[in-house]
């Protein structure tokens, strides 16, 4: 019996840095126009917002799954529980569960 593959993030830090190196080289070589850079900027900013939304969903889902703030804190940086606690407090003004947050994201996408 084979195990189901574990969920993975759709984008990684190393993939972004590799893309940045390639893009920077193309820009330095004069192969990318200003308009193309502006288009990429817009695309990257939208993707960044989508990553932030996904991060918020994962935070809610982890808490629902029983993760403590102390367990979650290291991914926020210095290991302080204040950061995820503050983010949860802000999220809870809009959604109490990961399901509610996903519904908000779906609505936002169709609006």
Task: List each language-model region with its residue ranges.
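General nucleic-acid-binding
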Residues: 1-35
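Short, Lys/Arg-enriched N-terminal segment that forms or immediately precedes the first helix
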Residues: 32-47
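Short, basic interhelical loop/turn and adjoining N-cap
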Residues: 37-40, 76-87
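Short, amphipathic alpha-helical "recognition" segments used to contact nucleic acids or chromatin
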Residues: 48-66
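The alpha-helix within a helix-turn-helix
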Residues: 72-74
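Short, Lys/Arg-rich amphipathic alpha-helical interaction segments
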Residues: 81-111
